[in-house]
């Protein structure tokens, strides 16, 4: 009876191992096949960035997982803006093309709220705040609407909808409407910004890979950001870590000009090390 129990136990253990290998690897459970999902997705982005595109079958072979697993990975990476799906695979994200604000608002919303909550800790009491245009700043506006006593300047029309619910002074800059992010821009906007001083500015980025600072996809957006930087005592850039894998069109500042960079803990360690030498990086 004892022998039979041990034998069955051995068989059961072997079957478990077999199932694990079948689910996680097509080649017998190598280290590549056992990568955690987040690690694999990070390497998928790096691979596509280096090659320009990749087929689902090739990725499945490379990472030793099923095609269905790769499809789920690519769906998630597309949702966070790290890659673009193509027929049978994926390509580099078209980061030079502006993405409508309605699309960006829902991406990584829980992460954005967590980052903005950390940003609230940097705001001086009764401070004057500048909020950039972008989906992350809408999260910040919703949090600020629960506070009172602040003066908030913004060029983002959608942001004012949220600020209207709070007990703060809200100032909207003038200028020409940019329908991509529902913000004002142009000479009137920069001219107004040049007349004010603020305690702290919160800025976003659509990607900073291959740049020495935060970057965006439109020159007019970069111009507004460049205008507010010298008018601010404190400059804070807030972005989720996926932007580390996206190369946007135009850099608007150097990291050494940024006082704080708030991002999540999925930021690649090499990127964290590099940025930490130039600015204060806060991981949430």
Feature names for model-found ranges:
Residues 4-31:
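Short, Lys/Arg-enriched N-terminal segments with co-localized hydrophobic residues
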Residues 15, 23-24, 75, 134, ...:
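Intrinsically disordered, low-complexity regions of eukaryotic proteins
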Residues 16, 28-36, 46, 53-57, ...:
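Conserved phosphate- and dinucleotide-binding cores of soluble alpha/beta proteins
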Residues 29, 33-43, 47-57, 62, ...:
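HTH-adjacent hinge/linker in prokaryotic transcriptional regulators
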Residues 64, 93-94, 179, 209:
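Short secondary-structure capping/turn micro-motifs that flank functional sites
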Residues 137:
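Conserved SAM/SAH-binding loop
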């Amino acid at each position: 009876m004892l022998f039979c129990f041990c034998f069955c136990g051995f068989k059961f253990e072997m079957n478990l191992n077999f199932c694990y290998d079948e689910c996680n690897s097509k080649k017998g459970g190598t280290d590549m096949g056992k990568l955690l999902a987040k690690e694999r997705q990070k390497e998928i982005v790096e691979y596509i960035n280096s090659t320009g595109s990749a087929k689902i079958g090739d990725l499945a072979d490379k990472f030793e997982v099923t095609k269905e697993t790769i499809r789920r990975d690519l769906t998630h990476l597309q949702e966070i803006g790290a890659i673009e799906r193509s027929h049978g695979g994926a390509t580099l994200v078209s980061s030079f093309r502006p993405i409508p604000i309605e699309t960006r608002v829902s991406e990584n919303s829980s992460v954005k709220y967590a980052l903005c909550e950390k940003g609230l800790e940097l705001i001086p009491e009764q401070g004057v705040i500048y909020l950039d245009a972008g989906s992350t700043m809408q999260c910040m506006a919703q949090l600020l609407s629960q506070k009172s006593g602040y003066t908030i300047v913004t060029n983002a029309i959608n942001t004012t909808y949220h600020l209207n619910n709070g007990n703060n002074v809200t100032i909207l800059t003038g200028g020409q409407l940019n329908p991509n992010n529902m913000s004002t821009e142009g000479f009137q906007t920069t001219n107004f910004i040049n007349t004010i001083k603020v305690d702290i500015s919160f800025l976003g980025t659509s990607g900073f890979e291959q740049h020495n600072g935060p970057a965006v996809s439109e020159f007019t957006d970069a111009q507004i950001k460049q205008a507010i930087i010298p008018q601010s005592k404190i400059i804070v850039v807030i972005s989720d870590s996926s932007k580390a894998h996206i190369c946007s069109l135009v850099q608007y500042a150097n990291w050494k000009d940024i006082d704080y960079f708030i991002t999540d803990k999925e930021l690649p360690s090499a990127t964290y090390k590099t940025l930490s030498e130039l600015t204060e990086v806060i991981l949430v």
